[in-house]
Amino acid sequence: MDEALRLQARAARAEVEAGTLRGEVLLELVLSIPFLDRDPWVDELLGIEPPPDVPSLPRGSVPYLPCGVDEILAMVRDVPLRPDDELVDLGSGLGRPLVLAHLLSGARCHGVEIHEPLVRSAKALCSALHLQAVTFVHADASESELDGSVFFLYAPFNGEMLARVVRRIEAVARRRSIVVCTVGLELRDVAWLEPRSSSNVSLSLYTSKVDRHG
């Protein structure tokens, strides 16, 4: 990313901090950035720094890797995410998906992350941007009570941990209709999820089909 784009992102960050850059205007700005520069540009916009060191990975979790901006844009558009939604990111990392999704949609956002250094960084980012509707908690998603209308997973778990997380999400689906969004993770074998179409080849969408009257 060249210096002109970096300066543009920093100028836009001031508008985000002031609460004046949101929604469609922000979306048009992000889409105007060349594809290969889009991820680092958004990180500069949001003030996301390189990830801090994290301790050894618990069994069933995977190393931190941020989700691509285009997958986030597709998720916001395809769900579609609205101001009355609550988006929950399981394995939320430094917060790129949640912060960008909130700025674009106005939805309340909540992240669950097992690595405390990443949680501290994500909280500091939201504080700097004055975003009170985006929160993060240090917790094991497979052991947490969950709630929300939209769930996002960027391949954060595998094996038995993933199975436990899916059961936690199913418990929410038994109370309310939800949408589950995944990147790099297929859940087509989960009986209570109905696959939906997606505009991005890496993004999978599912609607819950749990009998909430049984």
Segments the model singles out, each with a brief description of its role:
Residues 95-99:
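Glycine-rich SAM-binding Motif I of class I
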Residues 84-93:
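Conserved class I S-adenosyl-L-methionine
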Residues 1-82:
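S-adenosyl-L-methionine
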Residues 160-210:
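C-terminal substrate-binding/active-site "lid" region of AdoMet-derived donor-dependent transferases
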